[in-house]
A protein has these predicted regions:
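Active-site anion/phosphate-binding pocket segments in diverse small-molecule metabolic enzymes
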Residues: 1-140
Length: 140
């Protein structure tokens, strides 16, 4: 796992960052392919997602809405647990094989369809993305 130290500046013995090294040299940019205002709590029966999980919702949010974006990247590309939105107002709320859904919050977002959302990516995420033939890579 020397790559984790070299590319992410992680001290594998202590779990801490190495101060003299950069921790964020990789970025994942995912394109917004759909943007919609939706209820925070879905109406109707809630079934299992592709991973067999049933999402739970706070009934106190019934009647509230937020903006959701669908991104052009999914579970076949990366596990959402390996990425973190750079915008701390954005929350990853779900994923399917070919898309990730993010919640942009209750206020009309500055984002539009076609915009790229940047994400921090961890070591396992970088391994997955760099190995994928379906993800364009760009060295800056």
């Amino acid at each position: 796992r020397i790559g984790e130290t070299l590319f992410f500046g992680n001290n594998l013995f202590t779990g801490e960052d190495i101060e003299e090294m950069e921790q964020d040299i990789f970025r994942l940019n995912a394109e917004i392919i759909e943007l919609t205002e939706k209820p925070v709590v879905p109406i109707g029966e809630i079934g299992e997602n592709v991973a067999g999980e049933v999402k739970e919702f706070d009934e106190g949010n019934y009647g509230k809405t937020s903006y959701r974006a669908i991104l052009d990247i999914g579970l076949l590309d990366i596990d959402p647990q390996n990425i973190e939105p750079l915008d701390d107002q954005i929350e990853i709320t779900g994923a399917s094989s070919d898309m990730i859904v993010v919640d942009l919050g209750p206020h009309k977002p500055q984002y539009r369809v076609g915009d790229l959302l940047p994400f921090k990516i961890n070591y396992m995420g970088a391994l997955t993305i760099l190995s994928s033939q379906y993800i364009a890579k760009k060295v800056v």
